[in-house]
């Protein structure tokens, strides 16, 4: 975690230093602050967007990417990271930014049924040969089975993991205590 903070700080310092070098550029820069699993998607998408923008408006645009845990990224924006666009994993991460006035109130209503603009797939990984015979959510509750997932305070994916488990429990049990 310290290494990541130092890397981000070093990156920001370099950006500030280099932004004062050279002549005035006609290149428009956009900073997209996003969560880790979207890194490869946005590398590809940004290239297409930059080409589209150049062709459509005859101006160059460069998208700068910043990636980390969704919750950590939301806090960095709240604490001053200069984001032009945020693409985060969870509603509450964007709502945190909304409280600062950086995102318009009621942003969620722009989506059908106030839904999240992303989906997530949960995959259960097991040891080679599946020695504990794990096939479904029920199997994760057996003694001797451990679940490893990121911290939901900093990872949108971890929140989706917990929500997926809760969703499964709700289809199986109507008793809220059993669901927990």
Predicted regions: what they are:
Residues 1-9:
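Bacterial N-terminal signal peptides that target proteins for export
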Residues 14-15, 30:
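Residue-level signal for mature regions of secreted extracellular proteins and peptides
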Residues 16-20:
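C-terminal motif of bacterial Sec signal peptides marking the signal peptidase cleavage site
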Residues 24-155:
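N-terminal segment of the mature folded domain
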Residues 158-162:
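Active-site cradle of extracellular carbohydrate-active enzymes
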Residues 164-171:
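Helix-loop "lid/cap" segments that line or gate small-molecule binding pockets
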Residues 173-180:
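Ligand-binding pocket segment of bilobal, Venus flytrap-like solute-binding proteins
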